[in-house]
């Protein structure tokens, strides 16, 4: 793990030992880093969270999803690369009070984890009911409020508090890739579960920006905003600005900005070797907005 300053100069490098960083990280309230990781000595990949103390360099495993989903993990099979990628976590968001939101591409499910540092447990899940039926975890699903197509293979799930909402309510927005592929459950037919879901990383009809209103008190979630964006089966990101939205369709090599009416302001296409992992826009004093590109995951 490398630390860089605003000029892009490396100021520190941290050794994560047996753990390998992937996809995403976030700071907790103490300034420590929570990092999505794989254990190089383990039997599976992309299913753990580690904590890095940036002052001391100490590394600690704080979450192993295999311990929370033992029966489900045992039912999964290795992918074509010979890896047991049964969850494929691609996003982590810090909510405070030792709570995090995780996004699982392999299961097309969003997870809320509580009591992260003491005794982690799954508080709820947002996903396709059919996928989790006949498992011990189906009761953890929030109820869908309204008629809409569930997210598929989502990325860049973002937690947003709103002072205008009652306690227990908040927003989650995301890049809904609209893909259903689970190599760890090859018998599962996503086309039967999600209407018009795609199955190929490059060739597909459309992906979407999705925004959910989550009501923990009622145990529900509803789609409050969405619009179509260029298709990307994997990777990709969305970022809400004050009024606009920045969208990166990573496998298409396309990124652009949309206004509050979801009308495209400007779009760019990049030559790419593989994909554009994520795109963010930042404002710097005395300058026009700049785009920062994050390196692809390993």
Predicted segments with their positions:
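Histidine-/acidic-rich catalytic cores in large beta-rich domains
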Residues: 1-298
């Amino acid at each position: 793990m490398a630390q860089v300053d605003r000029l892009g100069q490396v100021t520190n490098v941290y050794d994560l030992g047996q753990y390998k960083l992937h996809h995403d990280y976030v700071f907790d309230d103490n300034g420590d880093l929570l990092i999505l990781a794989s254990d190089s000595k383990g039997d599976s990949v992309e299913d753990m969270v580690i904590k890095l103390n940036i002052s001391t360099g100490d590394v600690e495993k704080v979450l192993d999803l295999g311990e929370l989903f033992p029966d489900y993990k045992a039912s999964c099979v290795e992918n074509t690369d010979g890896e047991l990628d049964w969850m494929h976590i691609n996003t982590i968001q810090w909510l405070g009070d030792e709570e995090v939101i995780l996004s699982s591409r392999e299961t097309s499910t969003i997870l809320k984890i509580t009591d992260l540092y003491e005794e982690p447990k799954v508080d709820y899940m947002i996903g396709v009911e059919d996928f989790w039926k006949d498992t011990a975890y189906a009761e953890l699903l929030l109820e869908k409020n309204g008629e809409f197509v569930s997210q598929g293979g989502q990325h860049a799930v973002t937690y947003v508090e709103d002072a205008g909402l009652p306690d227990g309510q908040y927003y989650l927005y995301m890049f809904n890739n609209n893909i259903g592929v689970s190599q760890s459950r090859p018998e599962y037919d996503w086309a039967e579960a999600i209407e018009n879901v795609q199955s190929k990383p490059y060739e597909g009809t459309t992906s979407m920006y999705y925004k959910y209103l989550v009501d923990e008190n009622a145990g529900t979630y509803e789609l409050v905003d969405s619009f179509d964006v260029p298709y990307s089966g994997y990777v990709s990101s969305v970022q809400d600005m004050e009024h606009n939205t920045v969208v990166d369709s990573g496998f298409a090599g396309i990124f652009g900005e949309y206004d509050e009416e979801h009308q495209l302001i400007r779009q760019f296409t990049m030559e790419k070797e593989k994909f554009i992992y994520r795109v963010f826009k930042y404002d710097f004093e005395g300058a026009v907005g700049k785009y920062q590109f994050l390196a692809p995951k390993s």
